[in-house]
């Protein structure tokens, strides 16, 4: 080890010690981390409209807090973004204006006027009706009609006949389905219908209600639809205006009270506690703290979060993980990351929970070798009912089909758990899919984060985790990351050229370190330096607005940044210690504990 290496390790040791201490201070008594999502003006406006329509008296205190949040977060240009203090968007601005105009037309008259002027700058009513400019066109247009700011000309109907699809097809519909069912019921009640349409409405109403009833049973007394305040608001509005199922409406109202944030707002979905705990636990294991009782407690919490029942709404088998409790929907990303965390605790597929999680991933693998988020995709792309709401079914921003990040997490989990040894045909199929979707320059897109850095770094990490660090796809990923590193040493193309983010820098570094690049080379050294230097006074990192949710809404998540950055620095330190060599053949990573099938859980 050179003097330079020793100096580098000393700095990394200090930074990792400070960061792990800071994260342990945030750990909850049950062993998990909160995984806080940022407050969303758009989601807050949606929830406010729902409470105003369903129970304005009983929800008065929540409504007042939400209105105060919107009033104090309006931008200087009159608009609202997808998050506080971010660039105004048509979705965020129009939703906020609609809520204020519907609930407080006099008290907020000046703010409404400024907000509508910003909507006009986006293109006004014409832009709202244009699904290419307003991804939430149906929601936004309808709310502005309710508020008296737009006419109902061109208002789109949400087709309740989606409820009549055969079960195998209906299971392919993604997590916008509850909104589609509730708004389909609303449209059936409110919009004019001829004889044929009326017959369809009558036939589709019972299965649509049955679908929502079933989800309430899954979500439990403390859950909301899709564990999302925004989705729950849409269901609440649809059923309220349809005059149906006041019990389900009350269920939603209870959920709003449970999920309001301290600032008086709501996020697009419930806090990502499973993501956070998976990411941070893996990071602690990379650091070498796997035997720490606090990390062991986190692993026990992850185990307890595994779903033991079929999820009939997507066709997913038992054994998966969702993003939150009690009822986040089982998905490939959370399941892959949970398997990785448990494997890092010294358990391979001889462990029943690891085996079930890994088998869940194999059962969900698509025909082409990829993975999607919720449902297995056949040769026809997964249908998302949001296409029926916005009219752009083929848009890659709407379809929740195969995703490079989801696929990478699944591949890493299958390799690190021992479920799929090198050369396994399931891994070969995944590799072929990565090769197919990789751009000629080496970059790889993904569904759930903006930009290409997240996809490229994640795929590189996964390939290295299963012994394919020297493959052509991996080499092209490295080349792309080399060419796209920003002048400040970080990575980031999601927010614009040259704008480095913690998440993208960490994902790039994870891929490079897993692939065994020379740690003395400027590229990884500068990346690690960027991460160390961009911690805050609390020794943690500030998240960026690059997570993609329903219909192009964006969010930021604190522990995606913290967890990935922790992993990246720890893996870089390991790279420095071993000199950057990699055999290119699969071997159990050095940060994982020795497999012990008899280990007490």
PLM region spans:
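Preference for long, amphipathic alpha-helical scaffolds in soluble/luminal domains
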Residues: 1-601
